[in-house]
Amino acid sequence: MENYEALVGFDLCNTPLSSVAQKIMSAMHSGDLVDSKTWGKSTETMEVINKSSVKYSVQLEDRKTQSPEKKDLKSLRSQTSRGSAKLSPQSFSVRLTDQLSADQKQKSISSLTLSSCLIPQYNQEASVLQKKGHKRKHFLMENINNENKGSINLKRKHITYNNLSEKTSKQMALEEDTDDAEGYLNSGNSGALKKHFCDIRHLDDWAKSQLIEMLKQAAALVITVMYTDGSTQLGADQTPVSSVRGIVVLVKRQAEGGHGCPDAPACGPVLEGFVSDDPCIYIQIEHSAIWDQEQEAHQQFARNVLFQTMKCKCPVICFNAKDFVRIVLQFFGNDGSWKHVADFIGLDPRIAAWLIDPSDATPSFEDLVEKYCEKSITVKVNSTYGNSSRNIVNQNVRENLKTLYRLTMDLCSKLKDYGLWQLFRTLELPLIPILAVMESHAIQVNKEEMEKTSALLGARLKELEQEAHFVAGERFLITSNNQLREILFGKLKLHLLSQRNSLPRTGLQKYPSTSEAVLNALRDLHPLPKIILEYRQVHKIKSTFVDGLLACMKKGSISSTWNQTGTVTGRLSAKHPNIQGISKHPIQITTPKNFKGKEDKILTISPRAMFVSSKGHTFLAADFSQIELRILTHLSGDPELLKLFQESERDDVFSTLTSQWKDVPVEQVTHADREQTKKVVYAVVYGAGKERLAACLGVPIQEAAQFLESFLQKYKKIKDFARAAIAQCHQTGCVVSIMGRRRPLPRIHAHDQQLRAQAERQAVNFVVQGSAADLCKLAMIHVFTAVAASHTLTARLVAQIHDELLFEVEDPQIPECAALVRRTMESLEQVQALELQLQVPLKVSLSAGRSWGHLVPLQEAWGPPPGPCRTESPSNSLAAPGSPASTQPPPLHFSPSFCL
């Protein structure tokens, strides 16, 4: 019956069940053509098929007015869409040219395009009707070739199984998958396929090889991720609830005689627009409802296409490229290494726009088009499968990819105009795969210890709240600043007892603020301020670093989301969780009553200690020592500071600096003196005023001002540098880091003196902090590249905490990796690509351990002296032979989050 229905489209019968068909069906019933075991079940569906045949006959009558070419073409599609009577799930597909005669075969091959699709190959046990249909199809194909109709695209739609219930369920699943493919494979003529989508699942072997070759020779690739509802990365909502469905790639073909320009995309044929036959391919990465063998074949070819995309030498353009790379890594799964994406360079217009205007950190695609493109260009990003047809959605995606290409080229031209192209290409673009790899690797967390710590902190918070109510003489909401202000100053009058002339106020409040600086100034006058300070500290640890981490945990581990464009200084930022905000300094609390253990015993809690390395691995931390002070020394060129760093490296730079500043022997420098010097230095670096420094030091404002003046008088070149930075900002409206990063500061010309002073502080701060951020990013890139190039190292970069890089390393690789990391990072004082030559050496301190909160310093014997960066194995240049420290991993530290 299914054979009969399939052959209706070949005009063997235009009315259901003719006399000829009845005879054939009788022969089939006898068992010569059809298995008798399945005949009974097949006859049960006769009535349904008869209705389908009648309906199809009516459709044929309606089409008589159409041209002969369209009639023959659609008849052929109808035949192939209905399938064969007996098609094994293991049958494979062949090109349409396999059905052509020998004298027509060569001509048809030349007419095939990548958008050509597949037809099912017939089983060798096919019925007589199938053979007749095959001859009829051969006759039709000769007519089509004679009329120069080009390639014809067909698809498999029905598959027959012996068991009727199994056939029904599998056929429904396949029809659903085929219907989805129709949205991507426009069912019109082959020209329409070229203009819209080509699903790579429907390509034959010849077309697949042509696709790979086309990707290798492409002038540019424009990519976006598509979600199950039809939306893409180009939509306003960048975090859709729906899952990823596939990846769309618009391929810009190489112009005749043209050459790609991966290092300078704004040149040559790359600037030329797309032509009508530039293909748009669809790569499905969502699991499809077809049998495993074919699904695996589709996925394997999809991996090959994506792998070629990762290695492509032409410009690859993608909005939010980091998310695309992470999705590709997830699709590769266990079959792919993170090193497969290490060389990927994608042009991300959001990053380009952020370099031009750092204050606009998270613009949408539509925002960027409106801001940087011509007014006539419109963006269609709101169409989804829920409110538009698939063809409309797919057409919109193609048009938006063209707009994305044009936007990116315009932004690249602007980067060159602003002198930012080298920074974009050398520093920001290589970070994209690094951040994607970091997000794809989770860090293990000791969940049991974290839950225990949460309960302990919760009990301590309740005790502190009760103590606060007792010493205040009444109950109040301890987290309410207004109620606390009324208790401290309205009831207790502590501001009148303070020796300080004035305490900072908030807005127009009649009482001082309840900030940390004010509470520290009042802590010796009454027990309440001290209780409030401890309560806030414990509450922050519990809510942010314990309960917050528990909320982000999945399967006993966490993975932060890294934002490359989240700050104006160029620093990276993290969220869900903010791993950069987890303090390295432990806190001490008193054991709560009714808690296991001795009462009134001091516990030390380290939030970082809850992060533990995976089995067989160790954390390795590499920290730039005094990076911002070294940058300040380089920028200012102060002779005293240069002498401090250019001489033999000292054990404690800040102690030596204190000795220089206060003119006392190093042996007499106390810990308090050292900390005071450190805070003064960073007050200068960050542009903090005397008020903020006074709050940090816990001294009167006048004394803090004297510290600043004395320090700047000792190191006069620092003051000269600050004046030069401010003058440059007044002249150009922006400031620039040592690697060319710029920050516009329009308030530098404000009439309001307070706003203008703030902009001046930001100018000095940005030059130092932005330069340090650039150097840390450069360290990430060089170490990542060196590890990726190594045949032995497998270390994973798991976090960047500003001037610290955290790796997870296999235990036997710790010595080799530590040596490579130190040598690579310390060699960055000279970077030829950015024409950078620091006047001071860089120093990196290394530490390792099983827990992030309990890292121990690595002995100097583990690493060789600083030298030029190399990518080969450094195992021969470690410590002297026989040194036990050079052959053994650091001590194992499975320490709990609090040490008794």
Swiss-Prot record:
EC code: 2.7.7.7
Catalytic activity: DNA(n) + a 2'-deoxyribonucleoside 5'-triphosphate = DNA(n+1) + diphosphate
CDD domains with a match to the protein in the record: DNA_pol_A_theta
Main location: nucleus
Family: Belongs to the DNA polymerase type-A family.
Task performed by this protein: DNA polymerase with very low fidelity that catalyzes considerable misincorporation by inserting dTTP opposite a G template, and dGTP opposite a T template. Is the least accurate of the DNA polymerase A family (i.e. POLG, POLN and POLQ). Can perform accurate translesion DNA synthesis (TLS) past a 5S-thymine glycol. Can perform efficient strand displacement past a nick or a gap and gives rise to an amount of product similar to that on non-damaged template. Has no exonuclease activity. Error-prone DNA polymerase that preferentially misincorporates dT regardless of template sequence.
The protein's name: DNA polymerase nu
Taxonomic source organism: Homo sapiens
